[in-house]
Amino acid sequence: MLRTYQPKKRQRKKEHGFRKRMKTANGRKVLRRRRLKGRKVLSA
């Protein structure tokens, strides 16, 4: 059976990367929340 997680660096960056987050208002909200929470890593 095929495993569900087949990691790809490019796909990960494209979907969950910093620039993708910055593009939308909600994405920026995500980054803001993660900054306030004190996350070391904000996005993929």
Curated annotation (Swiss-Prot):
The keyword Ribonucleoprotein applies. Signal peptide: none annotated. One of its GO terms (molecular function) is structural constituent of ribosome. Residues 1-44 are annotated as: Disordered. The keyword Magnesium does not apply. GO terms for cellular component: ribonucleoprotein complex; ribosome. Keywords: Ribonucleoprotein, Ribosomal protein. Belongs to the bacterial ribosomal protein bL34 family. Residues 1-23, 29-44 have a biased composition (Basic residues). GO terms for biological process: translation. This is Large ribosomal subunit protein bL34. The gene is rpmH.
